[in-house]
Amino acid sequence: DDDCGWIMDDCTSDSDCCPNWVCSKTGFVKNICKYEM
């Protein structure tokens, strides 16, 4: 499914992002997808 959020995509929750990616809740990158190491 290519319709998921990659880095710097807006999100409101982790479900808006790709698998293994999370929606940042804090800081400069608040509410964007980031890779969860």
UniProtKB/Swiss-Prot annotation:
Record carries keyword Disulfide bond: yes
Disulfide feature: 4-18, 11-23, 17-33
GO cellular component, one term: extracellular region
Signal sequence extent: none
Primary location: secreted
Keywords assigned: Calcium channel impairing toxin, Disulfide bond, Ion channel impairing toxin, Knottin, Neurotoxin, Secreted, Toxin, Voltage-gated calcium channel impairing toxin
InterPro entries: Huwentoxin-1
Location(s) in or outside the cell: Secreted
One of the Pfam families matching this protein, by short name: Toxin_12
GO molecular function: calcium channel regulator activity; ion channel inhibitor activity; toxin activity
Tissue specificity field: Expressed by the venom gland.
Protein role: Blocks calcium channels (Cav).
Domain comment, as recorded: The presence of a 'disulfide through disulfide knot' structurally defines this protein as a knottin.
Similarity section: Belongs to the neurotoxin 10 (Hwtx-1) family. 01 (AU5A) subfamily.
Protein name per Swiss-Prot or TrEMBL: Omega-sparatoxin-Hv1a
